[in-house]
């Protein structure tokens, strides 16, 4: 029974974490309870005892730096050696883990996997590790998403074709001008001329504002029919067309003025206020961040000055005038 107790105590001793600064070269551990240790410095009188923790060894480093500054080189060498040892241990454990992963794993015999309609294996009931199961699940989800996207594309295509099939028959001499404010139907002239570029009785019709310069560049040159002598049988139709174009131009100008006034009122009411509020918030955040940085820099400079004064108590600043 005593042998078992001694063995368990030795195992606990081995499991205790001992930092490199307390390995016996600079400090000697006298007593350790958990993480708390009582040590003696190897370069101080033997009656001096220091207490600390193995998880926070900053006070031990500061003692060497303040009382035994000649040992800083040795402390640096010990630190480098401890880091190299830790690196070698990590690389060794990594190699062991890789060799364990490469070892063959016994897999039970699996039944024939059922194939879906598209030829992708979906039903896989094999005794595989959890990593393969997650990979299989990812493949399933990607396949399902791809299938849903294909179904949505085909549905959109069918809807568009059905809409095209259900469109009413529009005569060739009828044009539809679509605006953001109102829908205006205009009778076009025979011969392919556009109503947006035709002027009657010295009143030009404005082109569509939303179509852009590229649309205007693609249009043919404007034809002034007021200077062309009318053909027999077309005088009545041209007169009715001129009156309809006058009505269209008046309605178009009225709708344009209304939309411009509405947009200007909306711009004056809302966006300027939003922009100003956003600018105020941004400036407040910037000023707060600058203030915090100034305070941090001020405290750092005060700390540096106090540290220098502590390390050099007899220093007196004598400026050369």
Swiss-Prot record:
GO terms for cellular component: chromatin; nucleus. Keywords: Activator, Coiled coil, Nucleus, Transcription, Transcription regulation. It is found in: Nucleus. GO terms for molecular function: chromatin binding. Residues 146-162 have a biased composition (Basic and acidic residues). Residues 74-103, 147-167, 272-292 form a coiled coil. Residues 146-166, 227-248 are annotated as: Disordered. Germ cells specific. Expressed in all germ cells. During the first instar larvae, it is expressed in all germ cells of both sexes. In third instar larvae, it decreases in male germ cells while it remains in female germ cells. In adult ovary, it is expressed in cells of the germarium, including the stem cells. In the early previtellogenic stages, it is highly expressed in the nurse cells. During vitellogenesis, it is not translocated into the maturing egg. In testes, it is only expressed during some steps of male germline differentiation. Signal peptide: none annotated. Residues 235-244 have a biased composition (Low complexity). Its main location: nucleus. One of its GO terms (biological process) is oogenesis. Essential in the female germline for proper survival, sex determination and differentiation. Participates in the transcriptional activation of Otu. Does not regulate the expression of Ovo. This is Protein stand still. The gene is stil.
